[in-house]
């Protein structure tokens, strides 16, 4: 809408991606801050609370009455702010919005199932969830594959030229990236604000990378591929704004949890951003906390099945530190620090080619 107004009313400033990204940020922030307290009151009145896993550390039992599914609010705020701000002729931006819609549907269904049965493990069956994730990820990947100006090459940090062209196999690789990142963020969302800030730092990094990739001069200077994805930085900025508003209520002690509605959607969106910006490998550094949390689960399960011994006191790894009697705030802030430093390093690698 804003881009349309810039052309109709000749308001040139609204044609700039940076201006519309800033507007989208504040719109999403405002929508979230306005809607979230109302959602919290509604969730409390309808007992839409977070079911606590019986195996979780004892301190988690005090969170049993905390409303969940807050992700629906900030994802809605993001989509609304994006629709107001993006240029609809840019298919990459449209794809970004569709990614948010698709995976929020999965998360919503999962949250509703848990709330109805009042059981943390009673959400969608793992097989059902994987089928839905694969279906939506496949739709998004095929959509990208059909775009004429989007290549299927794999880029790695420090190299100015692509490693190789994946061809049609890129579709399957992208599906894995989206699903893996979606589930990784979901695993991380176990403490107040733990997944929120690393998501914000990752989104900020991708916003910068996407803006550079979409700019001919800047991408040429940094020896990066030039793809017309600049508009997606607007959607990413909107989600940063929405998450900033959500953090106001999600910081310790949390008044609301994002639920799978938020975590699965954020993860899938980060995967989408990594794919379109040709940063699939760099995603491992940008999303370092999500990678660490996921690896801890893989190691724990693998070790127990092979050796009947556990590597950690409990997985994901943030629970391990809880079992070692670390204060929740200490775990959260230290993970935030790691996430921030990882993203700074990731951005530095852009100059080293």
From Swiss-Prot:
Q: Where, per UniProt, does this protein localize?
A: Cell inner membrane
Which PROSITE patterns does UniProt cross-reference here? Answer: MRAY_1 (PS01347), MRAY_2 (PS01348)
Q: In which pathway does it act?
A: Cell wall biogenesis; peptidoglycan biosynthesis
GO molecular-function annotation terms? metal ion binding; phospho-N-acetylmuramoyl-pentapeptide-transferase activity; UDP-N-acetylmuramoyl-L-alanyl-D-glutamyl-meso-2,6-diaminopimelyl-D-alanyl-D-alanine:undecaprenyl-phosphate transferase activity
The protein depicted here goes by the name Phospho-N-acetylmuramoyl-pentapeptide-transferase
The Swiss-Prot or TrEMBL record describes its family as follows: Belongs to the glycosyltransferase 4 family. MraY subfamily.
Q: What does this protein do?
A: Catalyzes the initial step of the lipid cycle reactions in the biosynthesis of the cell wall peptidoglycan: transfers peptidoglycan precursor phospho-MurNAc-pentapeptide from UDP-MurNAc-pentapeptide onto the lipid carrier undecaprenyl phosphate, yielding undecaprenyl-pyrophosphoryl-MurNAc-pentapeptide, known as lipid I.
EC category = transferase
**Transmembrane regions:** 13-33, 66-86, 88-108, 130-150, 162-182, 193-213, 229-249, 256-276, 281-301, 330-350
Gene label? mraY
Report the GO terms under cellular component: plasma membrane
* Record's catalysed reaction(s): UDP-N-acetyl-alpha-D-muramoyl-L-alanyl-gamma-D-glutamyl-meso-2,6-diaminopimeloyl-D-alanyl-D-alanine + di-trans,octa-cis-undecaprenyl phosphate = di-trans,octa-cis-undecaprenyl diphospho-N-acetyl-alpha-D-muramoyl-L-alanyl-D-glutamyl-meso-2,6-diaminopimeloyl-D-alanyl-D-alanine + UMP
What InterPro entries does the record tag this protein with? Answer: Glycosyl_transferase_4, PNAcMuramoyl-5peptid_Trfase, PNAcMuramoyl-5peptid_Trfase_CS
Required co-factor(s) are: Mg(2+)
Stated EC number for the protein is 2.7.8.13
Entry keyword annotation includes Cell inner membrane: yes
Q: How is the protein disposed in the membrane?
A: Multi-pass membrane protein
**Assigned keywords, A-Z:** Cell cycle, Cell division, Cell inner membrane, Cell membrane, Cell shape, Cell wall biogenesis/degradation, Magnesium, Membrane, Metal-binding, Peptidoglycan synthesis, Transferase, Transmembrane, Transmembrane helix
Q: Does the keyword tRNA-binding apply?
A: no
What GO biological process, any one, is recorded here? Answer: regulation of cell shape
One Pfam family from the UniProt entry? Glycos_transf_4
């Amino acid at each position: 809408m804003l881009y349309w107004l810039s052309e109709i009313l000749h308001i040139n400033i609204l044609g700039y991606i940076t201006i519309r990204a800033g507007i989208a940020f504040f719109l999403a922030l405002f929508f979230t801050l306005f809607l979230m307290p109302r959602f919290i009151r509604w969730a409390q009145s309808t007992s839409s609370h977070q079911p606590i896993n019986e195996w979780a550390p004892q301190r988690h039992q005090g969170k049993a009455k905390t409303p969940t599914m807050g992700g629906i609010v900030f994802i809605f705020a993001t989509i609304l702010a994006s629709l107001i701000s993006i240029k609809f002729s840019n298919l990459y931006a449209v794809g970004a919005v569709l990614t948010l819609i698709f995976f929020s549907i999965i998360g919503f269904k999962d949250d509703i199932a848990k709330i109805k049965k009042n059981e943390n493990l009673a959400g969608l069956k793992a097989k059902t969830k994987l089928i839905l994730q694969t279906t939506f990820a496949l739709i998004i990947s095929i959509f990208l594959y059909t775009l004429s100006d989007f290549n299927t090459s794999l880029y790695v940090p420090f190299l100015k030229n692509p490693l190789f062209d994946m061809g049609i196999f890129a579709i399957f690789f992208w599906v894995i990236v989206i699903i893996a990142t979606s589930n990784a963020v979901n695993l991380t969302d176990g403490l107040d604000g733990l997944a929120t800030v690393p998501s914000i730092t990752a989104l900020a990094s991708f916003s910068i990378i996407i803006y550079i990739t979409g700019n001919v001069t800047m991408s040429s200077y940094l020896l990066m591929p030039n793809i017309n994805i600049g508009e997606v930085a607007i959607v990413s900025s909107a989600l940063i704004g929405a998450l900033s508003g959500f953090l106001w209520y999600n910081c310790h002690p949390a008044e609301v949890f994002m639920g799978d509605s938020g975590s699965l959607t954020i993860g899938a969106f980060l995967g989408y951003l990594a794919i379109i910006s040709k940063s699939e490998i760099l995603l491992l550094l940008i999303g370092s906390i999500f990678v660490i949390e996921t690896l801890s689960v893989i190691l724990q399960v693998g070790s127990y099945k092979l050796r009947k011994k556990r590597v950690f006191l409990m997985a994901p790894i943030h629970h391990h530190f809880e079992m070692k009697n670390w204060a929740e705030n200490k775990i959260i802030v230290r993970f935030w620090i790691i996430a921030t430093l990882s993203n700074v390093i990731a951005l530095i690698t852009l100059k080293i080619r």
